[in-house]
Amino acid sequence: MKLLFDFFPIVLFFIVYKFFGIYTATAVAMVASLTQVAFYRLKFQHYEKMHLFSLAIIMVLGGATLFFQNPWFIKWKPTGIYWLSALVFYGSSYIGSKPLIQKMMEANINLTTKIWYRLNLAWTLFFIVMGALNLYVAYHYDTDVWVNFKLFGGVGFTLLFVLIQAFYLTKHTDEKSFEKQ
């Protein structure tokens, strides 16, 4: 259910774009992101950092898209999120006691420090590649293709990456890791 909630703004953007175009879809995504953050706050009594991060980017780039009537600003949004995520993941390898991926997953899986750092680097590289891929599609194809890529390509590549990561992790975990759950 949380995954669906997390994808709520992008799914709404996709549907509205198909019927009303990029500017209406951008406005709806901005409102959906704001609603998502408010609802999460009311329900759980705190904010989720990723929702706030995404909200800030969509308000700035979505606002610029609407103000200047230029879709290129919103097309940069996924790249901004991917590349800032890459920076945060990479930085966490040098700032703090543990890489970010370890902080996120260590309650569910037991890995060596070396593997946590490799996994963190893999996510960093994944985010860099996805940001570059978004720009490639945005600049080499029309907006219809970019919108489809944004939803289906972004989600598809992420799921594929997680699946590959799961296979990699099975070689580096022991049975006790899975007994925790």
Swiss-Prot record:
Pfam families: IspA. It comes from Legionella pneumophila subsp. pneumophila (strain Philadelphia 1 / ATCC 33152 / DSM 7513). One of its GO terms (cellular component) is plasma membrane. It is found in: Cell inner membrane. It is a multi-pass membrane protein. The lineage of its organism: Bacteria, Pseudomonadati, Pseudomonadota, Gammaproteobacteria, Legionellales. The keyword Cell membrane applies. Keywords: Cell inner membrane, Cell membrane, Membrane, Transmembrane, Transmembrane helix. This is Inner membrane-spanning protein YciB.
